[in-house]
Curated annotation (Swiss-Prot):
Protein purpose: Component of antiviral defense system Kiwa, composed of KwaA and KwaB. Expression of Kiwa in E.coli (strain MG1655) confers resistance to phages lambda and SECphi18.
Result of knocking out the encoding gene: Cannot be deleted in a Kiwa-containing strain of E.coli.
Protein name listed in UniProt: Kiwa protein KwaA
Keywords (A to Z) from UniProt: Antiviral defense, Cell inner membrane, Cell membrane, Membrane, Transmembrane, Transmembrane helix
Keyword Transmembrane helix tagged: yes
GO biological-process terms attached to the record: defense response to virus
Location, primary (coarse class): membrane
Length: 195
């Protein structure tokens, strides 16, 4: 159960990777000087004026870690496979997440520390809601890297048919494909087409 929650939190952080990059671009204050009388402002001042971009950079590094973890997750199960009996694209969910939760942050001001704390709390609350409602799979960052979402029914030789699941895959899936799988929870799994 803890691994499932860890994976869900990781997918949510990964879904915010673009937001972290945009915030870094919007808020980084790195002084540039092209004259001969330039001097370094000091590491302490540089860090204190760039707290928000530094925090976003750390979370961006976490998102890279979770992306690499996700890419390798189906290697845990290279033996057991299921057959897809019904398949429908759900990739529009990524655009919904992008338009609803990431784009509005672009207009926010990050100058006031109280607002930054409120923004952080908002992102945490949205993450909790996404994880509790199992919408954490709607991930625009994965869409950029070629992952697709599918609503599928699967047939497992030992346990029969399971309906209405979400498959996340880098492959194009269709009915009658056999896929290796690794479940995040009861309804969402990573799929890799069996060759």
């Amino acid at each position: 159960m803890q691994r499932n929650t860890y994976n869900k939190v990781g997918l949510y952080i990964l879904s915010l990777a673009m937001l972290f990059v945009f915030i870094i671009i919007l808020t980084a204050k790195i002084p540039f000087c092209f004259t001969s009388d330039c001097s370094f402002i000091g590491l302490k001042k540089l860090v204190l004026t760039n707290i928000v971009p530094i925090v976003c950079f750390v979370f961006f590094l976490f998102s890279i870690y979770f992306y690499n973890r996700l890419k390798n997750i189906t290697k845990y199960n290279g033996q057991d496979s299921v057959k897809i009996t019904s398949c429908q694209s759900e990739s529009y969910e990524s655009l919904t997440f992008l338009a609803t939760y990431i784009v509005p942050f672009m207009g926010f001001s990050f100058e006031d520390m109280q607002k930054n704390i409120a923004y952080l709390l908002l992102v945490v609350v949205i993450g909790i809601i996404f994880i509790k409602t199992d919408k954490y799979y709607a991930n625009p960052t994965l869409a950029l890297f070629g992952f697709k979402l599918y609503r599928v029914n699967i047939l497992h030789p030992g346990s029969g048919e399971t309906k209405n699941l979400i498959a996340i895959s880098n492959d194009v899936l269709k009915v009658d494909d056999n896929v290796y799988y690794s479940f995040f929870d009861e309804f969402v799994f990573i799929a890799r087409k069996k060759i």
